[in-house]
């Protein structure tokens, strides 16, 4: 994210409910979303991890409607800084840290020709789209989209044939 994401936050005491400690130059302060700057329904699950100094916002500002980031895996909010929409989206993957599985999300951004510079946006969470994550290996494999480890993923999506089972017992891996 850009340092300007901190402009959407309000400094608070460390004991404030849902307060998150900042990073780097902001590490001595705790923050919550500023309800006057961030859209309703947003949340912070960790501090904003960004460079201390960056000219990127100034370079991008005039040519963009908004900036969408996903580096901070536990944050999901939208706000506006100097006419530019700043969007934070939590991780949608399962191979990294992040929010609880049913809160992992992707973000839908809708542009309407009647007001093209004011897109609508919403989080589409795993819990809302799919339901509770399963612990079945085949399902987890499909979500992670990673090659399975040894012994994981062998004939998980279809029942193995008799030949495949015999081959696995007497001379192979069962694949």
Residue ranges, per PLM feature:
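Binuclear metal-dependent phosphoesterase catalytic core
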Residues: 33, 39-61, 75-158
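Composition-driven, intrinsically disordered low-complexity tracts enriched in small residues
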Residues: 151-175
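His/acidic metal-ligating clusters that form di-metal
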Residues: 1-72
């Amino acid at each position: 994210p850009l340092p300007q994401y901190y402009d959407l936050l309000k400094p608070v005491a460390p004991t404030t409910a849902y307060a998150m400690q900042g990073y780097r130059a902001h590490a001595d302060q705790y923050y919550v979303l500023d309800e006057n700057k961030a859209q309703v329904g947003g949340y912070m699950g960790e501090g904003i991890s960004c460079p201390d100094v960056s000219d990127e916002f100034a370079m991008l500002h005039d040519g963009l409607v908004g900036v969408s980031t996903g580096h901070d895996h536990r944050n999901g909010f939208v706000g506006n800084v100097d006419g530019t929409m700043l969007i934070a989206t939590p991780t949608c993957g399962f191979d990294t840290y992040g929010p609880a599985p049913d809160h992992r999300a992707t973000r839908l951004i809708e542009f309407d020709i009647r007001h093209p510079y004011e897109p609508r946006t919403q989080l589409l969470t795993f819990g809302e789209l799919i339901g509770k994550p399963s612990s079945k290996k085949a399902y987890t494999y499909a979500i992670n989209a990673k090659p399975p480890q040894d012994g994981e993923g062998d004939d998980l999506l279809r029942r193995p044939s008799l030949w495949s089972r015999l081959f696995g017992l007497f001379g192979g891996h069962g694949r």
